């Protein structure tokens, strides 16, 4: 099936179900209360499971756009820490995958469909495969480095890296992203 890109908001009703769990995983990016965005992975996956269950069951991998591109470049399924932290309620310090949240939503089977390895920004994902190298006219084995969500990477480029700094980012979306001391 065609992917559900970030701006596809059909999973808005599912966000309410995610918030209603009151799960500790919501503290990662929603302060435990919400809001939860329909742009994020868990509501989208819940929407697919509820509305297209045959597709959810057949899916071997459920991932972000970046994971898909990295797979086609390197042959490795990995996830980006910036995406999983912001959109999957992933908390490395608490064991990573938000298992209790997924259980409460009837999505226990989702974690097995996610890329098992989470790679930090700037780490090498792998080398360019022969097929990708030929298609792109680049050298086979060229290192492919993990990126991140555009707005968060843009914050670094704007110098928003210390508490008290703020970035206003506009384009296909509009964001106000800040750094606090807490």
How would you describe each model-predicted region?
Residues 4-21:
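Short alpha-helix plus adjacent loop in nuclease-associated cores
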Residues 134, 138, 142-182:
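Catalytic phosphate/nucleotide-handling subdomain of diverse soluble enzymes
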Residues 14-15, 72-73, 98, 128-129, ...:
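Short helix/loop capping segments that flank catalytic or ligand/cofactor-binding pockets
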Residues 15-18, 45, 102, 175:
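A generic structural signal for short hydrophobic patches within well-formed alpha-helices
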Residues 17-19, 53, 76, 84, ...:
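Hydrophobic alpha-helical membrane-insertion segments
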Residues 1-3, 9, 25-148:
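Gly/Ser/Thr-rich active-site cleft segment
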């Amino acid at each position: 099936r065609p992917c559900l890109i970030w701006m596809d908001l059909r999973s808005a009703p599912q966000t309410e179900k995610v918030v209603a769990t009151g799960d500790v995983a919501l503290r990662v990016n929603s302060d435990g209360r919400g809001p939860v965005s329909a742009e994020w992975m868990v509501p989208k996956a819940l929407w697919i499971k509820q509305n297209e269950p045959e597709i959810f069951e057949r899916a071997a991998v459920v991932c972000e756009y970046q994971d898909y591109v990295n797979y086609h470049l390197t042959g490795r399924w990995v996830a980006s820490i910036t995406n999983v932290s912001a959109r999957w309620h992933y908390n490395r310090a608490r064991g990573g995958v938000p298992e209790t949240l997924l259980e409460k939503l009837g999505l226990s089977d989702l974690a097995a469909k996610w890329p098992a390895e989470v790679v930090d920004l700037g780490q090498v994902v792998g080398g360019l495969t022969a097929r990708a190298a030929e298609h792109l006219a680049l050298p086979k084995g060229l290192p492919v480095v993990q990126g991140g969500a555009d707005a968060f990477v843009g914050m670094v480029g704007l110098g928003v890296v210390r508490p008290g700094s703020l970035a206003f980012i506009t384009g296909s979306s509009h964001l106000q992203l800040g750094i606090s001391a807490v």
